[in-house]
């Protein structure tokens, strides 16, 4: 299994629709101002988060249970800047829609700009033949409110191509998050 380069990422995005919308180069400014970069890097693709957020709150004093998750634990927010409360988290989704090839596994890592501020991005791997918008989780590990900027870079996707195709892909087994288009809450 090997990590894939910028040339491969461009080819797969442009010819196979692996990433849409797609930025073939790293974008570092927008309308004259500096932004957290997004787009194609040497061995990865920096994704943006959309302006749709679900901010965790405990106003209902419920227990967080992944088998029986209460959607009331979140407050929906739409905007260019999301403020995450101290020691809390928010969910968002990528601007980009992904179509992962059958012989590729994609791993997501946080960007250092956010990590150096105590904001951690968590995403599970994008499995072979998974497709959809990626649900992102941002943890604010600080005792202060923290900002996340919509339509700017938030995480980097690394693509690993296997020497052979998997026997059963995410699509083959009917994965529960296949084709998700918005911020998706836990499912069992």
UniProtKB/Swiss-Prot annotation:
The keyword Hydrolase applies. CDD domains: trimeric_dUTPase. Its EC number is 3.5.4.13. It comes from the Bacteria. The active site is at 137 (proton donor/acceptor). Gene3D superfamilies: 2.70.40.10. Pfam families: DCD (PF22769). Pathway: Pyrimidine metabolism; dUMP biosynthesis; dUMP from dCTP (dUTP route): step 1/2. Keywords: Hydrolase, Nucleotide metabolism, Nucleotide-binding. It catalyses: dCTP + H2O + H(+) = dUTP + NH4(+). One of its GO terms (biological process) is dUTP biosynthetic process. InterPro entries: dCTP_deaminase, dUTPase-like_sf, dUTPase_trimeric. DCTP binds at residues 111-116, 135-137, 156, 170, 180. One of its GO terms (molecular function) is nucleotide binding. Catalyzes the deamination of dCTP to dUTP. Homotrimer. Belongs to the dCTP deaminase family. This is dCTP deaminase.
